[in-house]
Amino acid sequence: MFVKVLATTLFALAVLHTFAVKKFAQWAHHYPQGSLQENLLHFLAETEIVFGLWASVMFFAYAAAHRSIHHAVEYIENQLDFTEPKFVLVVMVVAATRPVVQLAERMILSVARLLPLKETVSFFIATLAFGSLLGSFITEPAAMTLLAMLLKDRYFDRGISRPLAYATIGLLFVNVSIGGTLTHFAAPPVLMVASKWNWGFWHMLSNFGWRSAAACFVSTLIVTAIFCRQLNSLQLPDASRRFIPTWLTGLHVACLAAVVYFSHYPDVFFGVFMLFLGLVTATREYQDSLKLKEGLLVGFFLAGLVVFSKLQAWWLEPLIQNMNGSMLYYGATALTAITDNAALTLLGSQVPNLSDELKFALLARSEEHTSELQSPDHLVCRLLLEKK
């Protein structure tokens, strides 16, 4: 019990740390640039490393509690499964490459041209309504990264107003979050629990998917109506794109499809990833810089959650089992304001014999809300708002 209480305490400290990152960044400016104190405080101010950092503290605390480093190693190696963090790392890097991004842009542009509106308006609708649903197939982190790159090029780099910028960011986060629920293998909150709860494709589509798709379209139309005048006033970007051979785009799509297909087999999809890195190196004239840093940070973030999750069942089980569907639904609403939705569903999956009603309430509410503490969202926000 001591180890479980310790794990919960460290998990709570990690959550509190996420709220203090801005303060650490401010303190860092009080020290000379390049000094130990300045670098340490900047390190502590990185949101994406918070849960991984505290997970490393948990590792050594676990070893100290058992008076053996081997017990801690055994816990990491044999009691935890890091397949999902590894998968998210790989799929984010593969999906954010120039051939895949340009293919997605052409697909979205084809949908946009079906709408009898100016392209700056129709592309906005197609990206945030139709594009958000891509997260159900190429995964939520990949779709988030890909759509952010398209929106940055066509809107954020063209001096849109702050209200439109923040409305677009919020709409992107929510739509991609709920748009990943058409399938059982794409969104991290679903991916973390689908196999344990035996939720397949048809279950997700019939219970969550159609509702999510409808919500994406309605919310996008509302935001578009509010900012229609500003979207109409924007100038079209330069339509020219650097040539990419069809065969190379096909190979990239094949690699992405293979990674998704083998998502439950880390040794296999990492092998595909190694081949992909070789392909990118050999065809560097058609490539942009890989988003390795972003993928690694998100993977590290999710891995930290995995380390903590297994030791939280002792307090979650009695808490959740004493709730009905409505109580859990609104409780999850409050929790997603301060923690990651993948963490919430992962923690909930540790409770045995959870009813179908409670499972639905937990996933529905955690997918419906996003918080500023979610690492993929935080990175995308930084990408969109940085200067060109």
Feature locations, PLM:
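Flexible interhelical linker loops that connect adjacent transmembrane helices
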Residues: 36, 113, 226-249, 284-293
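Helix-loop-helix module between adjacent transmembrane segments
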Residues: 92-98, 118-119, 130-142, 174-183, ...
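Membrane-interfacial helix-loop connectors
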Residues: 135, 141, 145-175, 188-207, ...
